Amino acid sequence: MIITNELNLPAPFVDAATSDYKYTPKRYSVTSVLKGVREAILQRRHDDEIEQDAADMVWAIFGSAVHSILENSQETAEQLKENWFSVDMGDGYELSGIFDLYDDATGTVTDYKTATAWKVVFGEFDDWKRQTLCYVWMLRAIGFDAKRGEIVAMLKDHSKTKAKADHTYPQHPVYRIGWDFSEQEIAECGEWLRGRFEEIKRAEALPDDELPMCTEEERWHKADKWAVMKEGRKTAVKLYDSEEEAQECVEEEGDKFYVEHRPGDDSKCRDYCSACAFCSHYKELINNVD
């Protein structure tokens, strides 16, 4: 990856954003396999061409700093911390991962995260759950009796004022959540991972434009909506999934009402995919807007 410095930030800041990481053929990390196959492969293929500005990597730097501090802490006799490991997935492919802490006494694998308070407010934990489940499966594969995943998240935008005013808002700037995984969940995770590597294997032979499309979930897709609006009012009276339903509502309400189309979007593609410049779907998205 090419790190730019549009704000002319001090060299130590840019150095912190720069990584000498190089992709290893046929080795995919847990975070990579949980992305869309298209995104994961495009990132690898175009790593030497992808540009990112140091100023846009501030939270990645913050996350790395947190991990570095916690890495130097003392674990107990039953705990392992900051361990890189890999599992053979067949045909020369490997699944790799780094867990932050594993407690052998409880079978719990813990990962430290930085996140927004709103992630907690909205209960958007599926990605965390999937990641720790993958770690549990991997630890099982190398002989540990792992059975629980846990996230300890530092909430970078936490507000004491909001915490005092709203009991549903996270009450502390650190949030802890965990999941006890059943034998069935762990087994199904292994089946999914093996299937994922089969997808990757097939996709690696395809040119960029023929790579399988990321799913709507992987693209963070929001569908088109049709808003019923009223003259003199800025917010929608009601939102509909189809233009026909919205039009029926307008006909019932009368002359002062009208339909406004609100196009859907793939926000991951638009704002959070580092390989978007090499993706035909992204190019189509921005061309449609233009």
Language-model-derived ranges and their functions:
Residues 4-5, 138-290:
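Metal-dependent nuclease catalytic regions and adjoining charged, substrate-binding loops involved
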Residues 1-109, 116-129, 140, 153, ...:
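Metal-dependent nuclease catalytic cores that hydrolyze phosphodiester bonds in DNA/RNA
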